[in-house]
């Protein structure tokens, strides 16, 4: 999920102290995603037996067998409905791409002290690998099924239903979505819209052949958020745009590591992306980094942590540190390379430093209670409130925004007529190695 470069006023805001128990602060009931038995009740009925023989016996009408979900080579159905915990017993989830540190940090791979520190992170790694495998399987469905003519609502529901099934939490019971589920609303931003767009109720938008679609998916398990995005384009004229951004993201991942300086990572990303150009309808465009969008750290139950990773050259000398978790994301554009807020808001999140304000509107009090119990500080959208049976909540929600309790995230757009692309991975700066937790065979 994209992080904007903060304004000077936002820079002055004090960062609230974080709770020692994020799960409790977010209303979790003490259960964890790995406590779920993940039982699956999709057993198929047996075919009806042959009718009894005998003279004059009436011929029984054959029962039409239920259509079975197709299974992939890994035992998963299509669409994916078998929880990841059933496919990987004993929490033996696949590792991400492990990359050894370079330079002065080469020693970390074999250092006994660092290996011991790494072993203390088993719960964190289990949760992240669980979420990452759910992410890979959900986006595998998207790669296969997202086609021109599909509505954005169907795409969003297809991805989100898959994620919830894969982590074994539907999110319909109070507090269930805080244990595991969507890390943030699925971003489906088209063409000059770069980020923070997901359909609200009644949305009629349909994906067209010449569209460039950014698919930004967040999966969380016990508040550990996997944030990873890719771009879909059906017309090959956009190939270089997608290649530029994918290459730039991989450059950022390569340069990232313990003691790496954020400004230098941004410079390397910019150099890579600006080495590309794309020809559209006979006109050549340089691929520009969207300079006011950043990568970012990820904290537990908080998608945007305290550090930002620029995608252009910066004087920021801040270093990455051991134990941090980063979303390395880059955005490229054929337009201005700068985005602004425009359009109907769909994304919201309760602020971690939300003030204690006396709310006068009953509707605001009611919807805040729903947010606290079902999302905590995880981002959500209007569809998620609709799904929980909430209605007539918009006035109350807007009141929470105006009181600084909830942050609204409008769509971020470049110049109309331009095209934008995005690629993103989540990386863990473990004591011994850098793990690209969301890496898959697709990107």
Curated annotation (Swiss-Prot):
PROSITE patterns assigned to the protein according to its UniProt record, in alphabetical order: MAP_2
Q: Name one GO biological process term.
A: proteolysis
Q: Which reaction does it catalyse?
A: Release of N-terminal amino acids, preferentially methionine, from peptides and arylamides
Q: Where does substrate bind?
A: 196, 304
Binding of a divalent metal cation 1 occurs at: 216, 227, 424
Query: What cellular-component terms does GO give this entry?
Result: cytoplasm
Q: What residue spans carry the Basic residues bias annotation?
A: 58-72
Q: List the disulfide bonds.
A: none
Q: Which GO terms describe its molecular function?
A: initiator methionyl aminopeptidase activity; metal ion binding; metalloaminopeptidase activity
Q: What are the UniProt keywords, alphabetically?
A: Aminopeptidase, Cytoplasm, Hydrolase, Metal-binding, Protease
Which residues does the record give as a divalent metal cation 2 binding sites?
227, 296, 329, 424
Q: Which domain of life is it from?
A: Eukaryota
Instruction: From the UniProt entry, list the residue stretches annotated as the region Disordered.
Output: 1-97
This protein's cofactor list reads: Co(2+); Zn(2+); Mn(2+); Fe(2+)
UniProt remark on cofactor binding: Binds 2 divalent metal cations per subunit. Has a high-affinity and a low affinity metal-binding site. The true nature of the physiological cofactor is under debate. The enzyme is active with cobalt, zinc, manganese or divalent iron ions. Most likely, methionine aminopeptidases function as mononuclear Fe(2+)-metalloproteases under physiological conditions, and the catalytically relevant metal-binding site has been assigned to the histidine-containing high-affinity site.
Read off the InterPro entries from this record: Creatinase/aminopeptidase-like, Met_Aminopeptidase_Type2, Pept_M24, Pept_M24_MAP, Pept_M24A_MAP2, Pept_M24A_MAP2_BS, WH-like_DNA-bd_sf, WH_DNA-bd_sf
Q: Which HAMAP family match?
A: MetAP_2_euk
Homology family = Belongs to the peptidase M24A family. Methionine aminopeptidase eukaryotic type 2 subfamily.
Q: What is this protein called?
A: Methionine aminopeptidase 2
